[in-house]
């Protein structure tokens, strides 16, 4: 980021929020391909059209020419960009990838300036996503209902442009973004919003992630603000909160007259806001209120999406579940609140009593079926979970194969270290371990049994001992606390994203 700031010469352009001139800078395309500012890498790959510096120079030169952008979106077969029909897709891809870097500039500079004003970075800026689970463990034990919410992509592309307009004042950049979005849509007049999102993901993942994160940020900021100010909302905007007209009057009346008989109703009015947690596009609302209260929030969210983002969600797509008999699928874990009963014998004088205590426990379980499906999709096993060789890796060296399998196994083990039950995690490790052995034996044209017999029992030992090695650096091996942690749940403070296999769709 420091190199990025040093090489971006905004000066007067940034003072007026002009980002469009950056599209004519060569280093922008170097950033788009994750090569930093090392132009020699581009020169070394001059035979590859995607990384050719010559093509970047040619693209910029022709953009400077008059009538540089000639593109008809009505007929994709006749489209011509920059006067070269056969290079239309290549040049269009280069411009969109460079533009994805450019639109991140205002947010990057704002982040740098905000961090520069503070000597110490606040802890919430460095918070691990694993910190969500201790929060859920602390809160969900006292709640009753949970509402699963999926923040969908807006059907109207203009909403994305309008959202970015609050941050970027450069009209040329906004017009260029609008041009790209409508070009994708006009490639097929019958394309649906869902197909458009899938196409945009494949065409330019960086631009898609930026726009989607910006949309989610806008959604969440408005939602939290309106929830905090819900008592001041006008009923014409949100039909679900029409009773807010008489909210204060009803509350005073209930407090004065029905305090003794309607304590539950009073509690609903006094504490209407549930706990809210979000990761990426999925969020949950949990409350200790009644089912009626959760249904109110459900229809409030539907009206909120319709009024602000033109997202027409079906009520059946928002699920209200009771925590006592429902598993919550969130961030790659299956979480639930389990009831534990224990019987205690108590004796008073000559009489003995059996006292049954019921306590709640927050369980986080590894979803074995989705994980095995992800491993099968990645060609580590078949659909039944039987390990197979990774044939595309047989051309690599033995050390590279071991390093790749070991890294995947360590990442999965690291992420699912907070699981209440480790048996499913051991099965995943077994699949990866045997898949690695099959891959190496296939490379050396040998059987798995002969290959393992030749290498000995220490082969791939790190697949199962990585977590123990990490803990042994912190606690003595023979301590009772250490032995408990090997079997218990561990939440780490350095995890910033879900592992790909856990987040696979």
Swiss-Prot record:
Q: Taking the first listed entry, what is the main subcellular location of this protein, grouped into a coarse class?
A: plastid
Any one GO BP annotation for this protein: RNA splicing
Keyword tRNA processing among UniProt keywords: yes
Query: Where does this protein reside within or beyond the cell?
Result: Plastid, Chloroplast
Q: Name one GO molecular function term.
A: RNA binding
Query: InterPro entries recorded for this chain?
Result: Domain_X (IPR024937), Maturase_MatK (IPR002866), Maturase_MatK_N (IPR024942)
GO cellular component terms listed in the entry, alphabetical order: chloroplast
List the keywords (alphabetical): Chloroplast, mRNA processing, Plastid, RNA-binding, tRNA processing
Job of this protein: Usually encoded in the trnK tRNA gene intron. Probably assists in splicing its own and other chloroplast group II introns.
Similarity annotation? Belongs to the intron maturase 2 family. MatK subfamily.
Protein name per the record: Maturase K
Organism for this UniProt entry:
Spinacia oleracea (Spinach)
Lineage of the species this protein comes from: Eukaryota, Viridiplantae, Streptophyta, Embryophyta, Tracheophyta
* Originating gene: matK
């Amino acid at each position: 980021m420091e190199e990025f700031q040093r090489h971006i010469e905004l000066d007067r352009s940034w003072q007026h929020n002009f980002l469009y001139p950056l599209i004519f800078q060569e280093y922008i395309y170097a950033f788009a391909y994750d090569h930093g500012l090392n132009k020699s890498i581009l020169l070394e790959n001059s035979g590859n059209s995607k990384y050719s510096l010559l093509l970047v120079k040619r693209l910029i030169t022709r953009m400077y020419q008059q009538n540089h952008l000639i593109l008809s979106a009505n007929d994709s077969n006749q489209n011509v960009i920059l006067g070269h029909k056969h290079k239309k897709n290549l040049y269009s891809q280069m411009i969109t990838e460079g533009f994805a870097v450019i639109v991140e500039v205002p947010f990057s500079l704002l982040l740098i300036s905000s961090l520069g004003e503070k000597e110490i970075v606040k802890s919430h800026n460095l918070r691990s996503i694993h910190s969500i689970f201790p929060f859920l463990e602390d809160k969900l034990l006292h709640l009753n209902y949970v509402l699963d919410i999926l923040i969908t992509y807006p059907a109207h592309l203009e909403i994305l442009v309008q959202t970015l307009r609050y941050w970027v004042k450069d009209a040329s950049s906004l017009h260029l973004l609008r041009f790209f979005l409508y070009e994708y849509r006009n490639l097929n007049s019958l394309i649906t919003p869902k197909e458009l999102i899938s196409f945009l993901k494949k065409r330019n993942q960086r631009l898609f992630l930026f726009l989607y994160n910006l949309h989610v940020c806008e959604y969440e900021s408005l939602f939290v603000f309106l929830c905090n100010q819900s008592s001041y909302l006008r009923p014409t905007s949100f039909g679900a909160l029409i009773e807010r007209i008489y909210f204060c009057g009803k509350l005073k009346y209930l407090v004065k007259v029905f305090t003794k008989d309607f304590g539950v109703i009073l509690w609903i009015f006094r504490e209407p806001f549930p706990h809210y947690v979000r990761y990426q596009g999925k969020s949950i609302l949990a409350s200790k209120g009644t089912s009626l209260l959760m249904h109110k929030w459900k229809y409030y969210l539907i009206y909120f999406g319709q009024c602000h983002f033109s997202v027409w969600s079906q009520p059946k797509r928002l699920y209200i579940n009771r925590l006592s008999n429902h598993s919550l699928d969130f961030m790659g874990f299956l979480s639930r609140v389990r009831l534990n009963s224990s019987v205690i014998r108590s004796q008073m004088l000559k009489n003995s009593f059996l006292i049954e205590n019921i306590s709640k426990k927050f369980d986080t379980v590894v979803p074995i079926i989705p994980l095995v499906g992800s491993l099968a999709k990645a060609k580590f096993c078949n659909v039944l979970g039987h390990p197979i060789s990774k044939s595309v890796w047989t051309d690599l060296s033995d050390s590279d194969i071991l390093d790749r399998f070991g890294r995947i196994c360590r990442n999965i083990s690291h992420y699912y270290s907070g699981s209440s039950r480790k048996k499913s995690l051991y099965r995943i490790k077994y699949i990866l371990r045997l898949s690695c052995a099959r891959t190496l034996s296939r490379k050396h044209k040998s059987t798995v049994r002969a290959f393992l017999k030749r290498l000995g029992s220490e082969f791939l030992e790190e697949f199962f001992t990585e977590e123990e090695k990490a803990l042994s650096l912190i606690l003595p091996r023979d301590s009772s606390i250490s032995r408990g942690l090997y079997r218990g749940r561990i939440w780490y403070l350095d995890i910033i994203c879900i592992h790909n296999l856990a987040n696979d769709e």
